[in-house]
Amino acid sequence: MTQVVNVVGAGLAGSEAAYQLAQRGVKVNLIEMRPVKQTPAHHTDKFAELVCSNSLRGNALTNAVGVLKEEMRQLDSLIISAADKARVPAGGALAVDRHDFAGYVTETLKNHPNITVLNEEINSIPEGYTIIATGPLTTDKLANEIVEATGKDQLYFYDAAAPIIEKDSIDMNKVYLKSRYDKGEAAYLNCPMTEDEFNTFYDALMEAEVAPVNEFEKEKYFEGCMPFEVMAERGRKTLLFGPMKPVGLEDPKTGERPYAVVQLRQDDAAGTLYNIVGFQTHLKWGAQKDVIRLIPGLENVEIVRYGVMHRNTFINSPDVLTETYELKGREELYFAGQMTGVEGYVESAASGLVAGINVAHKMLNKGEVIFPRETMIGSMAYYISHAKNEKNFQPMNANFGLLTTLEKKVKDKKLRYEKLADRALTYLDNYKQTL
Protein backbone atom coordinates (compact mmCIF):
# COMPACT_ATOMS: atom_id res chain seq x y z
CA MET A 1 0.00 0.00 0.00
CA THR A 2 1.66 3.21 -1.17
CA GLN A 3 -1.12 5.76 -0.65
CA VAL A 4 -0.27 8.41 1.95
CA VAL A 5 -2.66 10.13 4.36
CA ASN A 6 -2.27 13.87 4.89
CA VAL A 7 -2.81 15.04 8.46
CA VAL A 8 -2.98 18.83 8.55
CA GLY A 9 -2.07 20.27 11.95
CA ALA A 10 0.16 18.73 14.62
CA GLY A 11 -1.80 19.78 17.68
CA LEU A 12 -3.34 17.28 20.07
CA ALA A 13 -5.84 15.88 17.55
CA GLY A 14 -3.52 15.81 14.54
CA SER A 15 -0.70 14.24 16.54
CA GLU A 16 -3.00 11.52 17.85
CA ALA A 17 -4.49 10.86 14.40
CA ALA A 18 -1.04 10.59 12.79
CA TYR A 19 0.12 8.16 15.48
CA GLN A 20 -2.95 5.91 15.16
CA LEU A 21 -2.49 5.76 11.39
CA ALA A 22 1.25 5.11 11.57
CA GLN A 23 0.84 2.38 14.19
CA ARG A 24 -1.42 0.55 11.74
CA GLY A 25 1.19 0.63 8.99
CA VAL A 26 -0.24 3.61 7.09
CA LYS A 27 2.18 6.19 5.67
CA VAL A 28 1.46 9.73 6.90
CA ASN A 29 2.42 13.23 5.84
CA LEU A 30 2.09 15.28 9.03
CA ILE A 31 1.80 18.89 7.87
CA GLU A 32 2.47 21.62 10.45
CA MET A 33 3.02 25.28 9.55
CA ARG A 34 4.98 26.11 12.70
CA PRO A 35 7.75 27.33 12.87
CA VAL A 36 7.47 28.60 9.25
CA LYS A 37 4.37 30.51 10.34
CA GLN A 38 3.45 30.97 14.00
CA THR A 39 0.01 31.58 15.50
CA PRO A 40 -0.71 34.28 18.11
CA ALA A 41 -1.20 31.56 20.75
CA HIS A 42 1.81 29.26 20.21
CA HIS A 43 5.34 29.86 21.45
CA THR A 44 7.30 26.82 20.21
CA ASP A 45 7.63 24.56 17.18
CA LYS A 46 6.73 21.46 19.23
CA PHE A 47 3.77 19.24 18.38
CA ALA A 48 0.81 19.12 20.79
CA GLU A 49 1.86 22.37 22.47
CA LEU A 50 -0.51 23.18 25.34
CA VAL A 51 -1.30 26.84 24.77
CA CYS A 52 -3.43 27.40 27.88
CA SER A 53 -3.47 25.33 31.08
CA ASN A 54 -1.04 22.46 31.69
CA SER A 55 -3.87 20.38 33.17
CA LEU A 56 -5.72 17.66 31.30
CA ARG A 57 -8.33 17.81 34.08
CA GLY A 58 -9.59 15.05 36.36
CA ASN A 59 -8.10 11.57 36.35
CA ALA A 60 -10.60 9.73 38.56
CA LEU A 61 -13.23 7.46 37.05
CA THR A 62 -15.93 9.46 38.85
CA ASN A 63 -15.01 12.27 36.46
CA ALA A 64 -16.19 12.07 32.83
CA VAL A 65 -12.88 13.18 31.35
CA GLY A 66 -11.16 10.66 33.63
CA VAL A 67 -13.25 7.92 32.01
CA LEU A 68 -12.35 9.25 28.56
CA LYS A 69 -8.64 9.17 29.46
CA GLU A 70 -8.88 5.57 30.64
CA GLU A 71 -10.66 4.57 27.43
CA MET A 72 -7.88 6.23 25.46
CA ARG A 73 -5.21 4.41 27.50
CA GLN A 74 -6.90 1.16 26.51
CA LEU A 75 -6.73 2.27 22.86
CA ASP A 76 -2.98 3.10 22.94
CA SER A 77 -3.37 6.88 22.85
CA LEU A 78 -0.11 8.76 22.24
CA ILE A 79 -1.42 11.89 23.98
CA ILE A 80 -2.43 10.07 27.17
CA SER A 81 0.81 8.08 27.17
CA ALA A 82 2.76 11.35 26.89
CA ALA A 83 0.70 12.91 29.68
CA ASP A 84 1.28 9.95 32.00
CA LYS A 85 5.03 10.16 31.35
CA ALA A 86 5.20 13.96 31.83
CA ARG A 87 2.89 14.04 34.86
CA VAL A 88 3.47 16.55 37.67
CA PRO A 89 1.76 16.58 41.11
CA ALA A 90 -1.76 18.05 40.85
CA GLY A 91 -3.98 16.20 43.30
CA GLY A 92 -6.72 14.33 41.45
CA ALA A 93 -5.96 16.00 38.13
CA LEU A 94 -3.60 14.87 35.37
CA ALA A 95 -1.29 17.86 34.93
CA VAL A 96 1.93 17.77 32.94
CA ASP A 97 5.25 19.47 32.45
CA ARG A 98 4.22 21.08 29.17
CA HIS A 99 7.75 21.02 27.70
CA ASP A 100 8.31 17.34 28.50
CA PHE A 101 4.83 16.49 27.25
CA ALA A 102 5.17 18.24 23.89
CA GLY A 103 8.75 17.01 23.55
CA TYR A 104 7.70 13.38 23.98
CA VAL A 105 4.92 13.71 21.39
CA THR A 106 7.23 15.49 18.94
CA GLU A 107 10.08 12.99 19.21
CA THR A 108 7.74 9.99 18.97
CA LEU A 109 6.19 11.27 15.75
CA LYS A 110 9.39 12.58 14.15
CA ASN A 111 11.11 9.24 14.74
CA HIS A 112 8.23 7.07 13.54
CA PRO A 113 9.18 5.24 10.31
CA ASN A 114 5.71 5.76 8.82
CA ILE A 115 5.54 9.53 9.41
CA THR A 116 7.04 12.29 7.27
CA VAL A 117 6.87 15.76 8.83
CA LEU A 118 6.33 18.68 6.44
CA ASN A 119 6.79 22.15 7.95
CA GLU A 120 4.78 24.32 5.61
CA GLU A 121 1.59 26.36 5.48
CA ILE A 122 -1.08 24.98 3.20
CA ASN A 123 -3.90 27.10 1.83
CA SER A 124 -5.96 24.37 0.19
CA ILE A 125 -7.20 20.94 1.21
CA PRO A 126 -4.84 18.25 -0.16
CA GLU A 127 -6.09 15.59 -2.56
CA GLY A 128 -6.58 12.04 -1.30
CA TYR A 129 -7.16 10.86 2.25
CA THR A 130 -6.86 13.89 4.54
CA ILE A 131 -7.58 14.70 8.17
CA ILE A 132 -7.96 18.43 8.89
CA ALA A 133 -6.97 19.16 12.50
CA THR A 134 -5.95 22.81 12.34
CA GLY A 135 -7.65 23.92 15.53
CA PRO A 136 -9.29 27.17 16.66
CA LEU A 137 -6.71 29.41 14.96
CA THR A 138 -7.06 28.01 11.44
CA THR A 139 -5.68 30.43 8.84
CA ASP A 140 -8.17 32.48 6.84
CA LYS A 141 -7.22 30.92 3.50
CA LEU A 142 -7.66 27.37 4.73
CA ALA A 143 -10.89 28.37 6.49
CA ASN A 144 -12.23 29.57 3.14
CA GLU A 145 -11.37 26.18 1.64
CA ILE A 146 -13.22 24.46 4.47
CA VAL A 147 -16.26 26.63 3.78
CA GLU A 148 -16.09 25.47 0.15
CA ALA A 149 -15.97 21.83 1.29
CA THR A 150 -18.63 21.97 4.01
CA GLY A 151 -21.02 24.51 2.51
CA LYS A 152 -21.93 28.11 3.21
CA ASP A 153 -22.78 29.00 6.82
CA GLN A 154 -21.36 25.71 8.16
CA LEU A 155 -18.16 27.21 9.64
CA TYR A 156 -18.19 29.37 12.77
CA PHE A 157 -15.44 31.64 14.04
CA TYR A 158 -16.21 32.05 17.73
CA ASP A 159 -17.95 30.27 20.57
CA ALA A 160 -20.90 31.98 22.19
CA ALA A 161 -22.18 29.12 24.26
CA ALA A 162 -24.64 29.14 27.14
CA PRO A 163 -24.13 26.80 30.10
CA ILE A 164 -25.46 23.24 29.79
CA ILE A 165 -26.96 21.48 32.80
CA GLU A 166 -28.14 17.99 33.78
CA LYS A 167 -31.91 17.59 33.69
CA ASP A 168 -31.83 15.26 36.70
CA SER A 169 -30.46 18.10 38.85
CA ILE A 170 -33.34 20.51 38.09
CA ASP A 171 -36.02 20.87 40.80
CA MET A 172 -39.00 20.03 38.59
CA ASN A 173 -41.45 21.22 41.28
CA LYS A 174 -40.34 24.81 40.65
CA VAL A 175 -40.34 24.86 36.83
CA TYR A 176 -42.99 24.32 34.17
CA LEU A 177 -43.07 23.14 30.57
CA LYS A 178 -44.29 25.74 28.09
CA SER A 179 -43.44 27.49 24.81
CA ARG A 180 -43.96 31.24 24.47
CA TYR A 181 -47.61 32.03 23.65
CA ASP A 182 -48.14 28.23 23.59
CA LYS A 183 -46.84 28.13 20.02
CA GLY A 184 -46.01 24.60 18.85
CA GLU A 185 -45.24 21.89 21.37
CA ALA A 186 -44.26 22.81 24.93
CA ALA A 187 -40.54 22.64 24.29
CA TYR A 188 -38.99 24.71 27.10
CA LEU A 189 -38.63 24.29 30.83
CA ASN A 190 -39.33 27.68 32.42
CA CYS A 191 -37.90 28.96 35.70
CA PRO A 192 -40.20 31.75 36.98
CA MET A 193 -38.87 34.60 39.14
CA THR A 194 -40.55 37.10 41.44
CA GLU A 195 -39.32 40.70 41.42
CA ASP A 196 -37.32 40.10 44.61
CA GLU A 197 -35.73 36.95 43.17
CA PHE A 198 -34.82 38.81 39.98
CA ASN A 199 -33.26 41.70 41.92
CA THR A 200 -31.16 39.31 44.00
CA PHE A 201 -30.06 37.56 40.79
CA TYR A 202 -29.29 40.85 39.01
CA ASP A 203 -27.25 42.26 41.90
CA ALA A 204 -25.18 39.05 42.09
CA LEU A 205 -24.63 39.17 38.32
CA MET A 206 -23.34 42.74 38.51
CA GLU A 207 -20.81 41.68 41.16
CA ALA A 208 -19.73 38.49 39.35
CA GLU A 209 -16.15 38.18 38.14
CA VAL A 210 -15.53 38.18 34.39
CA ALA A 211 -12.80 36.01 32.82
CA PRO A 212 -9.90 37.85 31.16
CA VAL A 213 -9.87 37.93 27.35
CA ASN A 214 -6.76 36.76 25.47
CA GLU A 215 -5.26 39.35 23.15
CA PHE A 216 -5.71 37.16 20.07
CA GLU A 217 -9.42 36.71 20.88
CA LYS A 218 -10.41 40.36 21.17
CA GLU A 219 -10.92 40.97 17.46
CA LYS A 220 -13.73 38.42 17.17
CA TYR A 221 -15.17 38.70 20.67
CA PHE A 222 -18.25 40.83 20.10
CA GLU A 223 -19.23 39.62 16.64
CA GLY A 224 -22.77 38.32 16.56
CA CYS A 225 -24.08 37.97 20.08
CA MET A 226 -23.47 39.65 23.37
CA PRO A 227 -22.68 38.11 26.78
CA PHE A 228 -25.73 38.36 29.01
CA GLU A 229 -23.72 40.12 31.74
CA VAL A 230 -22.81 42.88 29.24
CA MET A 231 -26.48 43.16 28.26
CA ALA A 232 -27.35 43.47 31.96
CA GLU A 233 -24.91 46.37 32.38
CA ARG A 234 -27.18 48.49 30.17
CA GLY A 235 -29.79 48.63 32.90
CA ARG A 236 -31.62 46.57 35.50
CA LYS A 237 -34.56 45.88 33.19
CA THR A 238 -32.64 45.15 29.98
CA LEU A 239 -32.69 41.37 30.55
CA LEU A 240 -36.47 41.55 31.02
CA PHE A 241 -36.75 42.55 27.37
CA GLY A 242 -34.15 39.99 26.29
CA PRO A 243 -33.44 36.40 27.41
CA MET A 244 -35.50 36.74 30.64
CA LYS A 245 -38.63 38.18 28.99
CA PRO A 246 -41.76 36.78 30.73
CA VAL A 247 -44.32 37.75 28.06
CA GLY A 248 -46.32 34.77 26.82
CA LEU A 249 -44.94 32.49 29.54
CA GLU A 250 -47.71 32.61 32.15
CA ASP A 251 -47.37 29.97 34.85
CA PRO A 252 -49.99 27.27 34.11
CA LYS A 253 -50.39 26.59 37.86
CA THR A 254 -51.40 30.17 38.70
CA GLY A 255 -52.31 31.66 35.32
CA GLU A 256 -50.13 34.65 36.23
CA ARG A 257 -47.16 36.09 34.40
CA PRO A 258 -43.91 35.91 36.41
CA TYR A 259 -41.74 39.02 36.79
CA ALA A 260 -38.95 37.26 34.88
CA VAL A 261 -38.40 33.84 33.32
CA VAL A 262 -35.25 31.85 32.58
CA GLN A 263 -35.85 29.31 29.80
CA LEU A 264 -34.13 25.92 29.50
CA ARG A 265 -33.97 24.20 26.11
CA GLN A 266 -33.28 20.51 25.46
CA ASP A 267 -29.72 20.08 24.19
CA ASP A 268 -29.34 16.40 23.37
CA ALA A 269 -31.47 13.79 21.65
CA ALA A 270 -31.85 11.75 24.85
CA GLY A 271 -33.26 14.73 26.77
CA THR A 272 -30.76 14.43 29.63
CA LEU A 273 -29.12 17.84 29.03
CA TYR A 274 -30.59 21.35 28.83
CA ASN A 275 -28.99 24.68 27.94
CA ILE A 276 -29.89 28.02 29.52
CA VAL A 277 -31.33 30.07 26.68
CA GLY A 278 -29.55 33.35 25.95
CA PHE A 279 -27.02 32.95 28.76
CA GLN A 280 -23.86 32.99 26.63
CA THR A 281 -21.33 34.46 29.01
CA HIS A 282 -17.74 35.32 29.76
CA LEU A 283 -18.07 35.03 33.53
CA LYS A 284 -15.53 32.92 35.41
CA TRP A 285 -16.81 29.40 36.03
CA GLY A 286 -17.18 29.77 39.79
CA ALA A 287 -19.16 32.97 39.29
CA GLN A 288 -21.39 31.24 36.74
CA LYS A 289 -22.27 28.51 39.22
CA ASP A 290 -23.06 31.03 41.98
CA VAL A 291 -25.28 33.15 39.73
CA ILE A 292 -27.07 30.23 38.06
CA ARG A 293 -27.91 28.63 41.41
CA LEU A 294 -29.90 31.75 42.31
CA ILE A 295 -32.43 30.81 39.60
CA PRO A 296 -35.52 29.06 41.05
CA GLY A 297 -35.33 25.34 40.28
CA LEU A 298 -31.58 25.44 39.70
CA GLU A 299 -30.43 25.78 43.32
CA ASN A 300 -28.59 22.43 43.19
CA VAL A 301 -28.01 22.24 39.47
CA GLU A 302 -25.11 20.28 38.00
CA ILE A 303 -23.38 22.22 35.22
CA VAL A 304 -21.80 19.89 32.66
CA ARG A 305 -20.41 22.65 30.45
CA TYR A 306 -19.93 26.26 31.47
CA GLY A 307 -20.76 29.16 29.19
CA VAL A 308 -17.92 30.45 27.04
CA MET A 309 -17.22 33.20 24.56
CA HIS A 310 -13.92 32.94 22.77
CA ARG A 311 -12.19 32.81 19.41
CA ASN A 312 -12.70 29.44 17.78
CA THR A 313 -13.07 27.85 14.39
CA PHE A 314 -15.48 24.95 14.23
CA ILE A 315 -17.88 23.41 11.77
CA ASN A 316 -21.57 22.68 12.17
CA SER A 317 -20.77 19.01 12.67
CA PRO A 318 -24.30 17.59 13.09
CA ASP A 319 -25.10 18.76 9.56
CA VAL A 320 -21.86 17.74 7.87
CA LEU A 321 -19.96 15.01 9.80
CA THR A 322 -20.57 11.34 10.50
CA GLU A 323 -19.73 9.49 13.74
CA THR A 324 -16.34 8.62 12.25
CA TYR A 325 -15.56 12.36 11.80
CA GLU A 326 -15.84 11.96 8.02
CA LEU A 327 -17.34 14.73 5.89
CA LYS A 328 -20.68 13.58 4.49
CA GLY A 329 -20.52 13.21 0.72
CA ARG A 330 -16.71 13.37 0.56
CA GLU A 331 -15.41 10.07 1.80
CA GLU A 332 -11.68 10.82 1.81
CA LEU A 333 -11.96 13.98 3.95
CA TYR A 334 -12.07 13.84 7.75
CA PHE A 335 -11.89 16.44 10.51
CA ALA A 336 -10.56 16.18 14.07
CA GLY A 337 -10.02 18.31 17.15
CA GLN A 338 -11.78 21.45 18.31
CA MET A 339 -12.80 22.13 14.73
CA THR A 340 -15.36 19.31 15.05
CA GLY A 341 -17.06 20.79 18.10
CA VAL A 342 -15.32 18.87 20.85
CA GLU A 343 -14.06 21.06 23.66
CA GLY A 344 -10.90 20.37 25.64
CA TYR A 345 -7.42 18.90 25.28
CA VAL A 346 -8.41 15.29 25.92
CA GLU A 347 -11.58 15.48 23.85
CA SER A 348 -9.61 16.89 20.91
CA ALA A 349 -7.10 14.06 21.09
CA ALA A 350 -9.95 11.53 21.34
CA SER A 351 -11.51 12.80 18.12
CA GLY A 352 -8.13 12.47 16.41
CA LEU A 353 -7.88 8.91 17.68
CA VAL A 354 -11.29 7.99 16.22
CA ALA A 355 -10.61 9.75 12.90
CA GLY A 356 -7.15 8.17 12.60
CA ILE A 357 -8.39 4.65 13.27
CA ASN A 358 -11.23 5.08 10.78
CA VAL A 359 -9.03 6.36 7.96
CA ALA A 360 -6.64 3.46 8.56
CA HIS A 361 -9.51 0.97 8.49
CA LYS A 362 -10.85 2.44 5.26
CA MET A 363 -7.44 2.22 3.59
CA LEU A 364 -6.98 -1.33 4.84
CA ASN A 365 -10.47 -2.29 3.60
CA LYS A 366 -11.78 -2.90 7.10
CA GLY A 367 -15.14 -1.77 8.49
CA GLU A 368 -16.00 1.56 10.11
CA VAL A 369 -15.15 1.97 13.79
CA ILE A 370 -18.14 3.43 15.62
CA PHE A 371 -17.58 3.15 19.36
CA PRO A 372 -20.64 2.32 21.49
CA ARG A 373 -22.63 5.24 22.90
CA GLU A 374 -22.13 3.68 26.33
CA THR A 375 -18.46 4.73 26.06
CA MET A 376 -17.33 8.32 26.52
CA ILE A 377 -15.38 8.33 23.25
CA GLY A 378 -18.41 6.94 21.41
CA SER A 379 -20.91 9.30 23.04
CA MET A 380 -18.84 12.33 22.01
CA ALA A 381 -18.66 11.13 18.40
CA TYR A 382 -22.42 10.60 18.52
CA TYR A 383 -23.05 14.06 20.00
CA ILE A 384 -21.09 15.98 17.38
CA SER A 385 -22.87 14.13 14.57
CA HIS A 386 -26.38 14.03 16.07
CA ALA A 387 -26.76 17.06 18.39
CA LYS A 388 -30.42 17.93 18.81
CA ASN A 389 -29.85 21.66 18.55
CA GLU A 390 -28.00 21.58 15.22
CA LYS A 391 -29.15 25.09 14.23
CA ASN A 392 -27.22 26.50 17.18
CA PHE A 393 -24.52 23.84 17.57
CA GLN A 394 -21.86 24.68 20.15
CA PRO A 395 -18.74 22.80 21.27
CA MET A 396 -19.08 20.20 24.04
CA ASN A 397 -16.71 18.57 26.50
CA ALA A 398 -16.88 15.08 27.98
CA ASN A 399 -19.66 14.67 30.54
CA PHE A 400 -21.76 11.85 31.92
CA GLY A 401 -24.92 13.42 30.48
CA LEU A 402 -23.79 12.34 27.00
CA LEU A 403 -23.87 8.64 27.88
CA THR A 404 -26.97 6.53 27.41
CA THR A 405 -28.79 6.24 30.74
CA LEU A 406 -28.44 3.23 33.03
CA GLU A 407 -31.19 0.62 32.84
CA LYS A 408 -31.84 1.08 36.56
CA LYS A 409 -31.94 4.64 37.86
CA VAL A 410 -29.31 5.37 40.55
CA LYS A 411 -30.07 8.43 42.68
CA ASP A 412 -26.67 8.79 44.38
CA LYS A 413 -24.53 10.80 41.96
CA LYS A 414 -21.16 9.30 42.89
CA LEU A 415 -22.50 5.76 42.65
CA ARG A 416 -24.25 6.57 39.35
CA TYR A 417 -21.00 7.91 37.87
CA GLU A 418 -19.10 4.84 39.10
CA LYS A 419 -21.62 2.54 37.40
CA LEU A 420 -21.52 4.58 34.17
CA ALA A 421 -17.71 4.46 34.20
CA ASP A 422 -17.65 0.72 34.85
CA ARG A 423 -20.16 0.11 32.06
CA ALA A 424 -18.19 2.34 29.65
CA LEU A 425 -14.96 0.42 30.17
CA THR A 426 -16.74 -2.94 29.90
CA TYR A 427 -18.35 -1.92 26.61
CA LEU A 428 -15.02 -0.62 25.32
CA ASP A 429 -13.24 -3.84 26.26
CA ASN A 430 -15.88 -5.91 24.45
CA TYR A 431 -15.81 -3.64 21.39
CA LYS A 432 -12.01 -3.75 21.20
CA GLN A 433 -12.20 -7.49 20.59
CA THR A 434 -13.96 -6.79 17.28
CA LEU A 435 -11.32 -4.37 15.96
Curated annotation (Swiss-Prot):
Subcellular location: Cytoplasm
Keyword Flavoprotein: yes
InterPro entries: FAD/NAD-bd_sf, MnmG-rel, MnmG-rel_CS, MnmG_N, TrmFO
Biological processes, Gene Ontology terms: tRNA methylation; tRNA wobble uridine modification
Bilayer-spanning residue ranges: none
EC number, UniProt record: 2.1.1.74
Reactions that this protein is recorded to catalyse: uridine(54) in tRNA + (6R)-5,10-methylene-5,6,7,8-tetrahydrofolate + NADH + H(+) = 5-methyluridine(54) in tRNA + (6S)-5,6,7,8-tetrahydrofolate + NAD(+); uridine(54) in tRNA + (6R)-5,10-methylene-5,6,7,8-tetrahydrofolate + NADPH + H(+) = 5-methyluridine(54) in tRNA + (6S)-5,6,7,8-tetrahydrofolate + NADP(+)
Chief location: cytoplasm
Reported cofactor(s): FAD
UniProt keyword annotation of rRNA processing present: no
Gene Ontology CC entries for this record: cytosol
SUPFAM superfamilies, A to Z: FAD/NAD(P)-binding domain
Keyword field: Cytoplasm, FAD, Flavoprotein, Methyltransferase, NAD, NADP, Transferase, tRNA processing
Residues holding FAD: G9, A10, G11, L12, A13, G14
GO molecular function, one term: tRNA (uracil(54)-C5)-methyltransferase activity, 5,10-methylenetetrahydrofolate-dependent
Enzyme class (EC, first level): transferase
Family named by the database record: Belongs to the MnmG family. TrmFO subfamily.
Function: Catalyzes the folate-dependent formation of 5-methyl-uridine at position 54 (M-5-U54) in all tRNAs.
HAMAP family linked to this entry: TrmFO
Name of the protein: Methylenetetrahydrofolate--tRNA-(uracil-5-)-methyltransferase TrmFO
Species this protein is from: Staphylococcus saprophyticus subsp. saprophyticus (strain ATCC 15305 / DSM 20229 / NCIMB 8711 / NCTC 7292 / S-41)
Record gene name: trmFO
